């Protein structure tokens, strides 16, 4: 019996081999070749990007100017969303003192792979022509692909520094697949409205990553505690990511909203909610420290919670003061999450959430979904007009007889679907990632770029006393940087 246990332990917990010279190139080459083949078989330009079809469309619809092409309406929003995906998310994850290459570099890798797979997965569900078997893509498809990738990047935040790039490719492969299915169920079958993705992106991506992190729990992760934190310059780089996300979040939430008042209103509501969450985050962060000092962890993350929570309800008539209330509350809730919920989750639930995605994405996304359900159920003809209700909630076709109360119920059901897909899918993916074939780092080598990157030598070492704490704990109350000096030899 003891020999069997030793064999099992040896299979699932062998000595870590982080040499990915074969596995990473193999995965990248094979999967990219697969993308080329699948694109060749399925992907074609849509009517507004194919020259022949565009000329036919202009003639048929009496379009006199190329400015009517959807590209000119959607591309500014696409640019903003694309910057958020690769610069915003990438730099937000550079806060770790020795894992900035991995934060921004692996974000780049899985983003580039994920958007290709997303064009296929979402195309099969939303843009497949049954007569030709082809998928038509245009600028709106590019935006939706970026949205799809965002969920996997959010999941990466919970796993930051603890997994190999090969594992991240697997997380993205399954994450994009699960996203496409749950999005189709929520938006098409349940007919929920979720333009900014509180449910389908943030709630799903957050709990997907947290579940994987739970399955991959490392009881000896404290061996890398010296690296699980920030230094002054790494927090500054992370703040760059925060500012890009904060500035462009109105574009993120409104990018695929219908032209007209809905898109306009979505940008306004998101803009207002984001501003409100900044003030409440600063207030709670200062109040929680005995000398009133601000914690950069809170400022980098909780200030964005208003944008996450407004993702579903932003296109509804929530009113400007309603948007302020949403930002006000989520800024408080997110900051309290970093103060109390994350330490609780790590200690008692065995969930090691490196970036605190539960507080920035999962919890605000879930709240945003339920806020959307309440606002939808409370909609009236007096506020929207009958035509406005039809346009806002798309009460047409087989959904023409749906009431706002029923719509609110389905909106709430959409949140549950997102969480269910995240938890079940995350558990399965986590079990796959536990196989000893992925080249993941040992417990004492987590959060260290040197495992997977060629790292130049530092001119100066990092003094242990100047290390900032991580996104799970506070700084030691009795340590002040001014108490220490470096002696020159």
UniProtKB/Swiss-Prot annotation:
The keyword Nucleotide-binding does not apply. Residues 43-75, 122-140, 191-195, 257-266, 320, 381-412 are extracellular. It is found in: Apical cell membrane. GO terms for cellular component: apical plasma membrane. Residues 1-21, 97-100, 162-169, 217-235, 288-298, 342-359, 434-489 are cytoplasmic. It is a multi-pass membrane protein. InterPro entries: Ammonium/urea_transptr, NH4_transpt_AmtB-like_dom, RhesusRHD. Its main location: membrane. The chain crosses the membrane at residues 22-42, 76-96, 101-121, 141-161, 170-190, 196-216, 236-256, 267-287, 299-319, 321-341, 360-380, 413-433. It comes from the Eukaryota. Glycans are attached at residue 62. Homotrimer. Belongs to the ammonium transporter (TC 2.A.49) family. Rh subfamily. Functions as an ammonia transporter. May play a role in the elimination of ammonia in the gill. This is Ammonium transporter Rh type C. The lineage of its organism: Eukaryota, Metazoa, Chordata, Craniata, Vertebrata.
